[in-house]
Every structure is written in structure tokens, then in C-alpha cells.
Swiss-Prot record:
Region (G4): 424-427
Protein name: Eukaryotic peptide chain release factor GTP-binding subunit
Source organism phylogeny: Eukaryota, Fungi, Dikarya, Ascomycota, Saccharomycotina
UniProt biased composition (Polar residues): 1-25, 41-54, 228-252
Segments of this protein annotated with the region G5: 465-467
Function, as annotated: Involved in translation termination. Stimulates the activity of ERF1. Binds guanine nucleotides.
Length: 701
């Protein structure tokens, strides 16, 4: 470093006159001229009042090196473009300034490498302040900078790291983590400092935050500066530390952070609902078994429906000559259902106990409405099979043509793996809580349920009276029923093992219903993943992008998020209501559900009058979708007991056989393999009003 270089105020104006604005080459020469000079911040005791020794901030040096040198570094590190960009901005600003255009003048003030030239002018006009720095401190700083310069031609390193070090010294508490090691190791490890400093330096010229930093006063000034200047320096250092951190973070980490944000801890869900998980239960059984009455009584006993409403229904039922039906009217809401005393649609209701939240799906028991029942069963976690103990009614429901057997089979096919058999109407005069009648009912049904695949542990029997409420919330009175000491229905449901939920799986919601109400609203059960308000989804098989505008839970209340296993209504944007159909699936755009027309499946034929061969067509119920399907090829017959595949393809299939076949649908249908998502990979085949087969998708073709 040459000792004869001193700060000269007049020299500054000469420098800027000599600097050409018109030619990039001349500008570069000018840069080189200053690059050859190791540094411009020699100490002179006489110029202490107006000289800032750090050489990086404020005054002539800050203006000159912060602007020129900072710009030059960007030119050499980031390539010619960065340099050119700053240069053009300056050029535009300069022209604007010449034309006395105020807007252009602002640009001149705010952009390019010449920021600090203005800063110099402003400083010049301000009253001179006393700025002191001890000789020892200054020499320490000079030594550090000399060390950085020693073996390398890294004038740019000294300049950029100097800025960083100055700031680190001034306000360590606001500095980023990277800057702190740079400050502590500045003398010992120049290489480390270089690493730390580079990310910040690369962005210096482009970022207003960094430019701001260059104009802030140096540490020496801090002791004697008024509060106003001090307050200016803090935000600058804060914003600069942000720049440094942002630059040094790898791009991929953004994705990781996003994934972590999207992940939902099960504990969070517990906190949100007070530790209560959600269970969907479906009431199934033959017509007139008492499903709706029992559902209505549960709502009344749990306080979901108040006494006034029930009293009102009782009066209305009495007036209509249907006195005993008033509890079922809580579930059956339309006139046709009330006048005929039978459910047509799948009724939905919600109740809550101390331990869990429940959605009741009240399935129609009539033969004509089996497809509605299948749609309901596909959304349920637990099945409640209601059978009537009344003489004649049980037999009608259980015999061929009755819905008790078919509902139990359909529930199993749709993934309802736990079934509670509720023997209802035990208080009827023809029964009178008789143990013999109860045993008679459960023996035949138990054998049938085991035959269709229910494990012994997954079947529970209990006697109740849906009308009086005995055995529903409280246990049955021992005086009436001394032979049964098991739990009541709600007691059992509350203490049942918790369901497994894929809260962090890819989002999938098969649409079970749609409506128009100030926008498009769809409803269904979330089979996998979770959704937040404002989230983006994909509608399959349309491949339409959807935005979730609002989420409504079981109680019709708006909420911010919904999770796997919940019954929800979503208000969506991006598709019209007429373009939706039950069976469409809202899915995650990152891992969408598959859309298929041809697949391989394992099929068990449960009821078939004739035989089935290639070309046979029937109706397939898959989650909430209903689609016509054709047998393209029967590939293998499976042996009973061992499930061994036959080498030759069978010519036909008949009742009781298990086969592997290739099926084809007319339209694209959303599905997954049974192994990946059981709820979206199992199906039922129906023909002429009866369930002929059940199956699971083994391969998508």
C-alpha cells in the first residue's frame, strides 16, 4: 500500500469527469485503473474529521469503492450481464437527470453503482461531525485487510468482506449466522471469510438492501452518531443478513421446507378436535328393521337434536297417523320418506360423544335403492346391521330376496370390515326380551357373516330397543334382560380400536354428491391425505385444476382444514357443477389418482342364475362411481382354499367360483390397485337388481 495516497475532496470531481458514461470499454479501463491500486483508504490524522477509515461505507471511499468496486465485483463474478445492467440503469438515470426529469433523477438516485456518489454529495452538505478512532483500532483493521490481500489478487475479496466485517462489528446481534464466523476468524482464515462473503457479494449490486448497507455509517462513527443515524443502520444490517442467508440456502431446501409445512402431525389433529377422532357409521338392514328410528334416537340421546324438535316431530307424526314413526323423522326429512315410512336416499347426520365424533349414514333398506346403499357403505368405517327380532320380520329380511344378507355382503365388499349386529325391537310384545329368540337370530346370521369373510373378532352382537333407547346409550336394564351384560351400542363405539388414517398420504376424495349454492359444492369422504382452505387440487378424470374456496365439516361449520376419514363439503372454483358426477375424484396434483378403462381383477361370484363368460356385461360399483363393465378375458380359475391359479383359462364362471379376469369400462374411471388403496381398489358387480360378484383390482393395464 503506498503512503502518498490521501483523500482529496477535489480529486473526486476530477475522477467523475474523467469517467466516460458513453463507452463500456472506457468504463472498464477506469475500473482497471482502480483495481491496480490495492486500496484507497490510507490513514491520515489530519483528515480524521471528514475521513471514514473503514474504506467501505460513507464518505468518498464508501461512494467510490462501494459503488465502483461493488459493481466491478459483480461484473467479474456474475459475468458481463450484471455489470452491464448496473451500467445501463445508470445511463438511463443520467439521461433522465440531464433532461431535468424528476422520475429519471429518482432512478439515478436509486439504481446502479453510482448510488454512493450521491451519498457523498449529501454527506458534503451535512455539518461536519467529530468522528474519532484510536490509532490501535485502525492499525488492527488495516492488518486484517492486508492479510486478506497477501497471497491472492483479491482486491474484490477485501472490499466485499470488509463490508461484511464492518457490519459484523457494528451490530452482531442483527447479523446472520454466516457473518459471525466471518468476523471471528477474519485474521486466521481468509479462505473461510471468502466463502462466507461471496453469497452476499454476488447480490450486493442487485439488492436494494445491500446498497443501503453500503451507505450506512462505519463502526467508528457509531460512537458519536446521533440516534437518527443509528436507527438507520439497524434495518440495513437486518435486511442484509436476510440477503446473505437467502443466497446461501440451496434451492432444493425450499421444497423440503414446503413438504414439512404440508406434513401434518397427528398430534396437531388431536389438539384441533380435542383428541377426538372421526368415525363414519352406516345403518344397514332390511326395510322396516328400525334403522332410521334408531338413528333418530341416538341423535336425541346424545343431544344433537333438542327435545323441542323431537316433540314437534311427535305431534306431526300423530297428526299424520304415524305415531310410532316420529323418531325416524329426525333422519327421514323429505315428505315421500315420511309418508311411506321408508328411507330413499342415504340420510346423513352428525353426533358427538365424550370420546369421538360420528357421522351416521342411514342407508335405504328397500331393494330398489341398493345402489344408494353401496354409495353410503363405501364411505363408512363401521357397519351397524339392524335386524328385527319381531316374528316374521327377521325371517323376511334374512331369506333370499331380503336385504339383510345383501347389505352385509355389500358392506364387506365396500371395505366395512367391522360389523355390529344390533338385534332391534327386543321390547316388542312378540319377543319380550326373550333370550331364545335372540340366540335364534344371531346363530343363523353369524354363520352367514363368517361365510362372506368377516373374522370372528369383527362381528359383535347386542340386543337393543331403538324406540325406547334401551341398550343404545345406557346398558340394558338387568330386570328386563338379565342374560345380557355386555356394553351398550355407544359405549362399544367409543371404546373401539382407533382407525388407521393416512393423514400425510396423497389427497383423495371420491365425490358422492354435488350441489350449487353460491358456487359449486361437492361432498364426500376424504380417503387419504388432508386439505387446507385455499389448496389446489386436480379433478380426475377431467384433469381440471381446482381451488378449494371453503371447507365445511359435518356440522356445516366452515373450517380451515380437513383430514383423512372425515365427511366434508368443499366449495370449489375452476369447474361448473354440471361438469361433475359422482365417482369423480378430487386428488393431489403431485400424485394424482389413476384413470383407467382396462384392468385385471380377482373376482368372487356370489350369486348368479346362469353362467358368465367373455363378453358378459354388468354394472360395476367402485367407491362412489357406477360404471358399465365388460369381461374381456377370463384368465385363471382359482382353486378353493389354496387360491392356486389354473394353467388353462376357464371357458366360463358360475356361482361359487373365484376367477382372475380382465375387465373393461366404457368410460374412464378413477381407481387404484387394492394393494395400494383398498378403498379405491375394491368393487361390486350387479346385474338385474342383484349383487352377482365382488372383486378387487390387482393390476392396472
Amino acid at each position: 500500500m503506498s503512503d502518498d495516497q490521501q483523500y482529496n475532496q477535489d480529486k473526486l470531481s476530477q475522477d467523475f469527469q474523467n469517467t466516460s458514461i458513453g463507452s463500456g470499454e472506457q468504463q472498464q479501463q477506469s475500473y482497471q485503473q482502480y483495481q491496480q491500486q490495492p486500496q484507497q483508504n490510507n490513514f491520515n490524522a489530519n483528515s480524521a474529521p471528514t475521513f471514514t477509515p473503514s474504506g467501505q461505507q460513507g464518505g468518498y471511499q464508501g461512494g467510490y469503492q462501494g459503488g465502483y468496486q461493488g459493481g466491478y465485483q459483480n461484473y467479474s463474478q456474475g459475468g458481463y450481464q450484471n455489470y452491464n445492467q448496473g451500467y445501463q440503469n445508470y445511463n438511463q438515470g443520467y439521461q433522465g437527470y440531464q433532461n431535468n426529469n424528476r422520475g429519471g433523477y429518482n432512478n439515478y438516485n436509486n439504481r446502479g453503482g453510482y448510488n454512493n456518489y450521491n451519498n457523498y454529495n449529501q454527506q458534503d452538505q451535512q455539518p461536519v461531525q467529530n468522528q474519532g478512532m484510536s490509532l490501535a483500532d485502525f492499525q488492527k483493521q488495516q492488518n486484517a485487510q492486508a492479510n486478506l490481500n497477501k497471497p491472492k489478487k483479491t482486491l474484490k475479496l477485501a472490499s466485499s468482506s470488509g463490508i461484511k466485517l464492518a457490519n459484523a462489528k457494528k451490530a452482531p446481534e442483527t447479523e446472520s449466522k454466516e457473518a459471525t464466523p466471518a468476523a471471528t476468524e477474519k485474521e486466521a482464515t481468509p479462505a473461510a471469510t471468502e466463502k462466507e462473503a461471496t453469497p452476499a457479494a454476488t447480490e450486493k449490486e442487485a439488492t436494494p438492501a445491500a446498497t443501503e448497507k453500503e451507505t450506512t455509517p462505519a463502526p467508528a462513527k457509531k460512537e458519536a452518531t446521533p440516534a437518527s443515524v443509528k436507527s438507520e443502520s439497524k434495518p440495513a444490517s437486518k435486511s442484509t443478513s436476510k440477503v446473505a442467508t437467502k443466497e446461501s440456502t440451496p434451492v432444493t431446501s425450499d421444497k423440503v421446507i414446503q413438504e414439512q409445512v404440508d406434513e401434518v402431525d397427528e398430534e396437531v389433529v388431536k389438539d384441533m378436535f380435542g383428541g377426538k377422532d372421526h368415525v363414519s357409521i352406516i345403518f344397514m338392514g332390511h326395510v322396516d328393521a328400525g334403522k332410521s328410528t334408531m338413528g333418530g334416537n341416538i341423535l336425541y340421546l346424545t343431544g344433537s337434536v333438542d327435545k323441542r324438535t323431537v316433540d314437534k316431530y311427535e305431534r306431526e307424526a300423530k297428526d299424520a297417523g304415524r305415531q310410532g314413526w316420529y323418531l325416524s323423522w329426525v333422519m327421514d326429512t323429505n315428505k315421500e320418506e315420511r309418508s311411506d315410512g321408508k328411507t330413499i336416499e342415504v340420510g346423513k347426520a352428525y353426533f358427538e360423544t365424550e370420546k369421538r365424533r360420528y357421522t351416521i349414514l342411514d342407508a335405504p333398506g328397500h331393494k330398489m335403492y341398493v345402489s344408494e346403499m353401496i354409495g353410503g357403505a363405501s364411505q363408512a368405517d363401521v357397519g351397524i346391521l339392524v335386524i328385527s327380532a319381531r316374528k316374521g320380520e327377521y325371517e323376511t329380511g334374512f331369506e333370499k330376496g331380503g336385504q339383510t344378507r345383501e347389505h352385509a355382503l355389500l358392506a364387506k365388499t365396500q371395505g366395512v370390515n367391522k360389523i355390529i349386529v344390533v338385534v332391534n325391537k327386543m321390547d316388542d310384545p312378540t319377543v319380550g326380551w326373550a333370550e331364545d329368540r335372540y340366540k335364534d337370530c344371531i346363530t343363523k346370521l353369524g354363520t352367514f357373516l363368517k361365510g362372506i369373510g368377516y373374522a370372528k373378532d369383527d362381528i359383535i352382537f347386542m340386543p337393543v330397543s331403538g324406540y325406547t333407547g334401551a341398550g343404545i346409550k345406557d346398558r340394558v336394564n338387568p330386570k328386563d334382560c338379565p342374560w345380557y351384560s355386555g356394553p351398550s351400542l355407544l359405549e362399544f363405539l367409543d371404546n373401539m380400536k382407533t382407525m388407521q388414517r393416512h393423514i400425510n398420504g396423497p389427497f383423495m376424495l371420491p365425490i358422492s354428491g354435488k350441489m350449487k349454492d353460491m358456487g359449486t359444492i361437492i361432498e364426500g369422504k376424504i380417503e387419504s391425505g388432508h386439505i387446507k382452505k385455499g389448496g389446489n387440487l386436480l379433478l380426475m378424470p377431467n384433469k381440471a385444476s381446482i381451488e378449494v374456496v371453503a371447507i365445511f365439516n359435518e356440522t356445516e361449520q366452515e373450517c380451515d382444514a380437513a383430514f383423512c376419514g372425515e365427511q366434508v363439503r368443499l366449495k370449489i372454483k375452476g369447474v361448473e357443477e354440471e361438469d361433475l358426477a359422482p365417482g369423480y375424484v378430487l386428488t393431489s396434483p403431485l400424485k394424482p389418482i389413476k384413470t383407467i378403462t382396462r384392468f385385471e381383477a380377482q373376482i368372487a361370484i356370489v350369486e348368479l342364475k346362469s353362467i358368465l363368460s367373455n363378453g358378459f356385461s354388468c354394472v360395476m360399483h367402485l367407491h362412489t362411481a357406477i360404471e358399465e363393465v365388460t369381461f374381456i378375458e377370463l384368465k385363471h380359475k382359482l382353486e378353493k382354499g389354496t387360491n392356486r391359479k389354473s394353467k388353462k383359462p376357464p371357458a366360463f364362471a358360475k356361482k361359487g367360483m373365484k376367477v382372475i379376469a380382465i375387465l373393461e369400462t366404457n368410460e374412464s374411471v378413477c381407481a387404484e390397485t387394492y394393494a395400494d388403496y383398498p378403498q379405491l381398489g375394491r368393487f361390486t358387480l350387479r346385474d338385474q337388481g342383484t349383487t352377482i360378484a365382488i372383486g378387487k383390482i390387482t393390476k392396472v393395464l
